[in-house]
From Swiss-Prot:
The lineage of its organism: Eukaryota, Viridiplantae, Streptophyta, Embryophyta, Tracheophyta. Contains 2 SPKK motifs which may interact with the minor groove of A/T-rich DNA sites. Phosphorylation of this motif may regulate DNA binding. This motif is reiterated in both termini of histone H1 and in the N-terminus of sea urchin histones H2B, but its presence in the C-terminus seems to be unique to plant H2A. PROSITE patterns: HISTONE_H2A. One of its GO terms (biological process) is heterochromatin formation. InterPro entries: Histone-fold (IPR009072), Histone_H2A (IPR002119), Histone_H2A/H2B/H3 (IPR007125), Histone_H2A_C (IPR032454), Histone_H2A_CS (IPR032458). It is found in: Nucleus; Chromosome. Residues 118-146 are annotated as: Disordered. Core component of nucleosome. Nucleosomes wrap and compact DNA into chromatin, limiting DNA accessibility to the cellular machineries which require DNA as a template. Histones thereby play a central role in transcription regulation, DNA repair, DNA replication and chromosomal stability. DNA accessibility is regulated via a complex set of post-translational modifications of histones, also called histone code, and nucleosome remodeling. This is Histone H2A.1. A motif (SPKK motif 2) lies at residues 137-140. A motif (SPKK motif 1) lies at residues 128-131. GO terms for cellular component: nucleosome; nucleus.
């Protein structure tokens, strides 16, 4: 018989494991209580907040990993984080007021500053055959002939 003194104890299962999360639910709950955001904190609030934070982190890291791969790098640096966040419309709006240290700026050249097309390039464009666009679809033309 397993009594109070000795015996087999069950392994503790954390709330993060129960929720299937990597982020620490207990620690987030402790921060919510210690931060005095409200008098009381519900039991589901830290779980939900941990899930939201984990989703946002995964989203940013995936985009930053893609940016690193585009730059032929295997390590994510702050520059890749900035490119990921600023090139994504929703994340850019969410983190509009955030400055990422050592992130740099988004590359942008005003079209006025770009060099004008050379006459040779303009002639090439003029000589290339353009497709004729008609307003009616081919099916409508057949129906109109009958």
């Amino acid at each position: 018989m397993a009594g109070r003194k000795g015996g087999d104890r069950k392994k503790a299962v954390t709330r993060s494991v129960k929720a299937g999360l990597q982020f620490p639910v207990g620690r987030i709950g402790r921060y919510l209580k210690k931060g005095r955001y409200a008098q009381r904190v519900g039991s589901g609030a830290p779980v939900y907040l941990a899930a939201v934070l984990e989703y946002l982190a995964a989203e940013v890291l995936e985009l930053a990993g893609n940016a690193a791969k585009d730059n032929k790098k295997t390590r994510i640096i702050p520059r890749h984080l900035l490119l990921a966040v600023r090139n994504d419309q929703e994340l850019g709006r969410l983190l509009a007021g955030v400055t990422i240290a050592h992130g740099g700026v988004i590359p942008n050249i005003n079209s006025v500053l770009l060099p004008k097309k050379s006459p040779a390039a303009a002639e090439k464009e003029a000589k290339s055959p353009k497709k004729k666009t008609s307003t009616k679809s081919p099916k409508k033309k057949v129906a109109a002939k009958e």
